[in-house]
Amino acid sequence: MTNTNETIFALSTVFGKSGVAVIRISGNYALKALNHFHIKKEIKPRFATLVDLYDDSSQLIDNGIIIYFPAPNSFTGEDVIELQVHGSKAVIKIILEELSKVFVMAKPGEFSLRAFLNGKFDLTQIEGIADLIDAETKMQAKQAIKQISGELERLYSNWRQRLITIQSKIEAYIDFPEDIWAEKSELEKINNEVQSLVQLIQEHLNDNRRGERLREGLHIVITGEPNVGKSTLFNFLAKRDIAIVSEYAGTTRDILEAHIDIGGYPIILSDTAGIRESSDPIELEGISRAKKRSFEADLRIELFPFEQRHDVNYQATGNIPSVVDTQLCKYCNQQTVSSQCLTLGSRYKNTCKLCNRQWILETCAENNVHSWIPVSATCMTSDQNDTIYVLSKADDVINNHNIKINGIDLLPISILKEIGTNKLISLIKEKAEEKFGHDRDTPVITRQRHRNHMKKALEHLQRFNIDNPIELISEDLRLAAFELGAVIGIIDVEEILSSVFSNFCVGK
């Protein structure tokens, strides 16, 4: 994969105008850079030294800081030179050209690969470094730092060592069966230890993908009928004008995305086409995409128009205005759902089953009225924690207290008058904390690669049966330990290493 005998170099900072640019050199001959740039000063290890850098013709290139990290006490475990020069494109280009005369340009992730090969980090720590570089929010950085500190490595190494200990006992029986395997108590201890590991790995896998979600971002979709304020809310949360806002219904056809930070959590916010009946094939495609994205989302913000109708009963009791009754109920056409639902003023008492999505889906399917199913029903989830219900355009609302229907909270908001917006943001943060597992100290799986190996390890352990032939027992334990070792990189599998390090930038 790489020739570690070569001395490599690369720009470690972004190429462009900046105050400082850092160029890293690593390898057995890194100190040759001193002679190449005609540096005469004594360079003390781990001290910053101001030097002048000259080219082959003794022309001054720049002055900057040089730091020497002798092996093995460096990032890569090799001799490392770091040059800190002015962040000028011209200076950077000249220095890189000079270095290419004596060294080899590093491949993406090659510095980190050498650090791994020299035992400075395990694979999960290396991946943590990549995640920290990519982190855009506080919580992403916090998770990456935990991984760099060796949190996952310690957990998986402990499990792997326990398996190796069990396997050593079984291997001993193969050589000396009369000494060990005859004791029933020893059999029970081994079986209990394996079952304990099975339970621990199962619990580790049943984490609702918290770590992966935090790395990738929580997918939130804004849904609702046309012209209910979806794009206005989208632009407000994104803090910039991305979607076109118009009084004409159906402006948004395709899905728009924005990456935002709410309370330190990464959010991928999507604005979608309004859900309605249409004969326009382009709009229908947009509606289809909206429903699909809503189904796949981690969280939905579902909008209904408030449209104040001077409902005295609402002002007095907090009940929802009749117009919203109509808005919500019209999906249940021609008494296919519940006659009580269609009665204006019913206020969705216990007879109303609108908020039971699975019930709506089944009932509408029985009566062949799929076109009337709202997007909330098409999501096919009965977990109301996955949806935030919002009454939009509530410009005339007296207060921003939640309105309850059948125990479901609907939040009135007005972007124009900034009513309920802070409450909505707080609610999104609360939902994100629930999804990500706020402030949990338990190590979490952060990549699909980890999850795949853990699943395979679990499969081998679940096949463990103390009554099986001893050779099969030993093989299952060996394979389970192999999968755990693959996560942290104890085994030498080039496909795994290529997959991990190919995603790094050059210079890291």
UniProtKB/Swiss-Prot annotation:
GO molecular function term, any single one = GTPase activity
Q: What does the entry give for GO biological process? A: tRNA methylation; tRNA wobble uridine modification
What SUPFAM superfamilies does this protein map onto?
Folate-binding domain, P-loop containing nucleoside triphosphate hydrolases, TrmE connector domain
What's its top-level EC category?
A: hydrolase
The prosthetic group or cofactor this protein requires is: K(+)
Q: Which domain of life is it from?
A: Bacteria
A cellular component annotation (GO) from this entry: cytoplasm
* EC assignment: 3.6.-.-
List of residues binding (6S)-5-formyl-5,6,7,8-tetrahydrofolate: 24, 82, 120, 508
Subcellular locations according to the entry: Cytoplasm
**Residues in domain TrmE-type G?**
217-433
Under InterPro entries, the record lists: G_TrmE, GTP-bd, GTP-bd_TrmE_N, GTPase_MnmE, MnmE_dom2, MnmE_helical, P-loop_NTPase, Small_GTP-bd
| Function noted in UniProt | Exhibits a very high intrinsic GTPase hydrolysis rate. Involved in the addition of a carboxymethylaminomethyl (cmnm) group at the wobble position (U34) of certain tRNAs, forming tRNA-cmnm(5)s(2)U34.
- NCBIfam families from the xrefs? mnmE_trmE_thdF (TIGR00450), PRK05291.1-3 (NF003661), small_GTP (TIGR00231)
Sequence similarity? Belongs to the TRAFAC class TrmE-Era-EngA-EngB-Septin-like GTPase superfamily. TrmE GTPase family.
* HAMAP family, A to Z: GTPase_MnmE
Q: How does it assemble?
A: Homodimer. Heterotetramer of two MnmE and two MnmG subunits.
What this protein is called in its record is tRNA modification GTPase MnmE
Q: What is the lineage of its organism?
A: Bacteria, Pseudomonadati, Pseudomonadota, Alphaproteobacteria, Rickettsiales
